[in-house]
Each structure stands twice: as C-alpha cells, then as structure tokens.
C-alpha cells in the first residue's frame, strides 16, 4: 500500500497540469455533502480539463463505486450522510476494479490515521487542502501511470 501523505499547509506557488489533446480526460468521483466545498473543488478540477462527478451522500457514492463506470481518482469527504468516507474507501479497496484507484480524503476532522487504515493514499485537511488538490492529483496520477508502465 502507498504511504499516506498528509498535507495541511498553504502553498505559495501555483501548480498547473498538462492536458494533452490526445490524452483521455481524467475522471474524478468527488463525494462531498457540503455544496460550497463541492462547487469550489469542481471549479478547480474542471479548470484542469478533468471531468468531475459529484455525489452528496455516502449511499449514492457506494453505488457508483461498486458500479462499472471508470474513475481515475476518488476524492472523498469523511463526514457524509449514509455511509461515511472511510467506509467507502475500505469498500473500494476490496473491489478488483477499484483497488488500485488513487484515493484522497479531503476532510475537516483530523483523521489521518483512520484514513491510512482505510486505504487512502493522501489526506488533505479542509480548508487548506483544497488549494493542494491539483498538485496532489497530478502527483498521484503520475505515480499510478509509472506503476502501470
């Protein structure tokens, strides 16, 4: 399992991602019940040319994670109605088609250890972590691509 990274500070430099015209669009499932956080994250991620699908509760997210739609990354809050984010990650890690998918926990509560135990690759603390999304996702996707080569 990949070592969990915790990022809680502000970043001074601006990060950007390279989107190649022939490259497939990155697809992200974002599970977040706070409309403001979901909107800000969507704006940041879509500015990179990435496709974002948002779920507002854990039960709907559980169905999507269990389904066959391909996601390049799961971005999950912990405090959700229905199934919590750590339960979603634990479930996803048990699925053949999701076990290698990069997973990021973006949460307000200090649950780094619990996120590690559940199988998260990275823990980002709200609100500071929102500014680290692009850099973090680029790094995780780059690491996954190297593993696949």
Describe every region a protein language model picked out.
Residues 1-29, 129-149:
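Non-catalytic signal-transmission and effector/linker regions of two-component phosphorelay proteins
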Residues 76-77:
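Active-site residues of response regulator receiver
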Residues 86-99:
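Short amphipathic alpha-helix used as the core "switch/output" element in two-component signaling
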Residues 54-73:
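Acidic, metal-coordinating helix/loop segments flanking the phosphotransfer/catalytic sites
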Residues 32, 107:
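Conserved acidic carboxylate
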Residues 35-53:
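Two-component/phosphorelay signaling modules centered on CheY-like receiver
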Residues 57, 84-87:
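Acidic catalytic/metal-coordinating carboxylates
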Residues 87, 108-126, 131-135:
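Alpha4 helix (beta4-alpha4-beta5 surface) of REC/receiver domains from two-component response regulators
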